[in-house]
Amino acid sequence: MKVSTLGIDLAKNVFQLHGVDHEGHTILRKKLTRAKFVQFVIQLEPCLIGMEACSSSHYFARLFTRYGHEVKLIPPQYVKPYVKTNKTDATDAEAICEAVTRPNMRFVQIKTEEQQAVL
């Protein structure tokens, strides 16, 4: 099971993950607590990770990049059109996973710690 693209819906305590292989087939649907989330993602083989841009997403993007992942942050308004059914954490993660692979998607630049400290 090699995840090529991972969509992550970030929340305060529980994180929803949706992963697909290189053919776009769903191979991972997982809900993890904060304590298990980072360790799980770090141990994955490097892949493309998509997250909605928010204050905590910049921290996770910097962290996962250090482990070889390619991380892209998407403005929330660009994820919404990809939600296929009722809005849940699982459908959001799936929508993020799909949106991050779109060739014309606009992404948010990952902020450094210094840039975030200014805010």
What does each model-identified segment do?
Residues 1-119:
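Phosphate- and other anionic-substrate recognition elements at nucleic-acid/protein interfaces
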